[in-house]
Amino acid sequence: MAGLYLHIPFCRRKCPYCDFYSEGVCDTTIQGYPDLLKQHLAWASKHGWSGSFDTVYFGGGTPSLLSPKAIADILHTIKQRFGLIHNAEITLEANPGTVTQENLVGYRNSGINRLSLGIQTCNDKHLANLGRLHDRQEGLDAFDLARVAGFDNISLDLMFALPGQTEEELESDLNDYLELDPEHLSCYGLTAELETPLYQQVTSGEMSLPDADFYADAFIGVHDKLSQNGYDHYEIASYAKKGRTCRHNLGYWQRRAYLGIGAGAHSFCAKEWGERREVPSDLAAYRDAVCSGQDPTQHLEGFDRESALSETVYLGLRTRRGVSDSELQQRFGCTLQEAFPEAVAASAPWLTCNNGRWTLTPAGWLLFDRLILPFL
């Protein structure tokens, strides 16, 4: 089975911290975009991609700028061209500032069964600093509207280590989220990515992010609070109630095949050692390629045995499932210890092995970027 990702690269206003590809809103462009996606799906079905999908993910950008009818038409094309398994997970990312009761009901009726709401924080001051369209009450209302619309699988984004954030403010956010009682939480520390307005603000001294000690305390504090309240910390930034992990993202971390549709989307073909392809982040070029029946993708990254092994370890150690020696032996002919003896030794305080399965502790996840380097 494979996953399907569809990129909807439109935003009413781009957040200053975001480095994902997006375009400004133009009604004509948005209205024509679903047809491009359907043409791209048709092309992919004739050029190497076949079989049913078990997960579909509408990401962005702001997918909730598309109408429920547009989403329904795209899902109909997916079923026609490929098929969806029974109980496929179908996720739509939504901005609380763009949803209404009517369109949430429409999304649910179209086949969307998992909603990812980008609330980020319930603090009005921090929402303003992050450049979000919504305020605290609109975020809370969007969640309630989603419940009324029939969504019983909702994920919320939580950002921490925000400029000027206090421990008390983060604790208040966590309490607000727990009161909402979502099935899933994606919790990210704010980082200043290159070529974003936030990066320019930080490097110029206009804005400062919390120091490493605050970040570490916040990461562990989020882990402790959510773990004590019934959430499984199953990946560095992901928490879920029992049976509510994000199946689509698990496919990424397990190096399963996925097809990317839309400007800026990536695909991964799992044949042999694997190949990653991308659609350039250029809407005009994407439109030209799709409308002329050409391949809109280009080669991004190829893998040999060594690079595939390193990526398998990199992705696996991000998760609580970890890395299995038996699976490495079957796929690569070695155990983790045999392949990376020095890296394993250097990670010993944070890397544990139980019955041939290697996992990082929560403290190890906090140090992930440093600990993983010797494995790459």
Task: Describe the residue ranges of each PLM region.
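Short, amphipathic alpha-helical interaction segments positioned at domain boundaries
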Residues: 363-376
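Alpha-helix C-terminal capping segments
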Residues: 44-48, 177, 343-348, 375
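Minor-groove-contacting beta-hairpin "wing" of winged helix-turn-helix DNA-binding domains
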Residues: 357-361
